[in-house]
Swiss-Prot record:
<feature type="topological domain" description="Extracellular">
    <location>
        <begin position="61"/>
        <end position="412"/>
    </location>
</feature>
<keyword id="KW-0812">Transmembrane</keyword>
<keyword id="KW-0325">Glycoprotein</keyword>
<feature type="region of interest" description="Disordered">
    <location>
        <begin position="1"/>
        <end position="30"/>
    </location>
</feature>
<comment type="similarity">
    <text>Belongs to the strictosidine synthase family.</text>
</comment>
<keyword id="KW-1133">Transmembrane helix</keyword>
<feature type="glycosylation site" description="N-linked (GlcNAc...) asparagine">
    <location>
        <position position="159"/>
    </location>
</feature>
<dbReference type="InterPro" id="IPR011042">
    <property type="entry name" value="6-blade_b-propeller_TolB-like"/>
</dbReference>
<feature type="transmembrane region" description="Helical">
    <location>
        <begin position="40"/>
        <end position="60"/>
    </location>
</feature>
<dbReference type="GO" id="GO:0009986">
    <property type="term" value="C:cell surface"/>
</dbReference>
<dbReference type="GO" id="GO:0016020">
    <property type="term" value="C:membrane"/>
</dbReference>
<feature type="topological domain" description="Cytoplasmic">
    <location>
        <begin position="1"/>
        <end position="39"/>
    </location>
</feature>
<dbReference type="GO" id="GO:0004064">
    <property type="term" value="F:arylesterase activity"/>
</dbReference>
<keyword id="KW-0472">Membrane</keyword>
<dbReference type="Pfam" id="PF03088">
    <property type="entry name" value="Str_synth"/>
</dbReference>
<dbReference type="Pfam" id="PF20067">
    <property type="entry name" value="SSL_N"/>
</dbReference>
<protein>
    <recommendedName>
        <fullName>Adipocyte plasma membrane-associated protein</fullName>
    </recommendedName>
</protein>
Amino acid sequence: MNEAEGLRQRRPLRPQVITEDSPAQEAKEGSAYSSKVFRVTFLTLAASLAVPLLGATVLLDCPIDPQPISLKEPPLLTGVLEPNNKLQKAERLWENQLVGPESIVNIGDVLFTGTADGKILKIEDGEVQTVARIGHGPCGTPEDEPTCGRPLGIRVGPNNTLFVADAYYGLYEVNPGTGETKMLVSTKTLIEGQKLSFLNDLTVTQDGRKIYFTDSSSKWQRRDFLFLVMEGTDDGRLLEYDTVTKEVKVLMVGLRFPNGVQLSPAEDFVLVLETAMARIRRYYVSGLMKGGADMFVENMPGLPDNIRLSSSGGYWVAMPVVRPNPGFSMLDFLSEKPWIKRMIFKLLSQETVTKLLPKRSLVVELSETGSYRRSFHDPTGLTVPYVSEAHEHNGYLYLGSFRSPFICRLNLQHV
């Protein structure tokens, strides 16, 4: 072997260049490509949805002009307010024989209620009968309500006559025996320059002389109650009607959805449930504080509807919407976000939003000073949905509803 051949053999080998990708490299590049495709696809889809949605929210009219409402953090559901299933022990009565029995009274063992089809009904010996109706048909749709009529609050007067607040027609006295109706206050009458658009509840003195009643809004009618809650309109009032002089006086103004009302046992003050603010106001009608007002219960665990006396000297309050804590309260979340409310009602109807709200029900008993004595819950709302009132009679709570096709009855000895 000569020297040249030896040099050729000792020449170092050139490094080999690997041209095929390794499996790890392929996976990495494939993942990066897939991620890029996903991002592009997602952004394209989001843009395709956002553009028409944004256009809709800009171009569509919103039926409400919501104002920010400042609510305190809901009270903790502990102690007396701790959730339970006690309302689920209630039984349903007269199912599909009536609809929307908002308020309930009794004369002896005979029950009376007003319903969503404009009727005032009598329930005697288990039989449902029509006593009277204030409006006229057709009934059954929101568009029909103003002519059909909607009796809400109902009370018994000293001569066993019925006093009824019809949301659209006004304040009436009804003879439960003959069905004769007598108008006391018409919604067509301007009271201090403001119309009555949404009569709601009433409470009557023992001698029948004074009737205190709420007008929930001068802008919104009953069929638009959810607009009233979400907008936070503060045009509600508490009024007084004198059955002798026929005069109507305005006692309180600036209320956000005033709803149920109840005279105290001593008849020295009237409690007014301010639904949109989750609280109870007190207005003094006699004594040294006459004409004054203060807070009776603040920051309640739900939105209160009607209030009635309990046999222990306190008050029953029904709440069809609960503010769970711990938990998520949609109404509290939206309270200071008017822009979200606008978007919701540009895209969805009241009926759709109502169906989306949790059907959780709560009834509380308050002491004579406003402290919580006990609470009855239906966490699912399957037994007692849309509760509007708790009327105590003969050891039972009769539970009204503003839209359910039945009355629920709860035996107080079993809870």
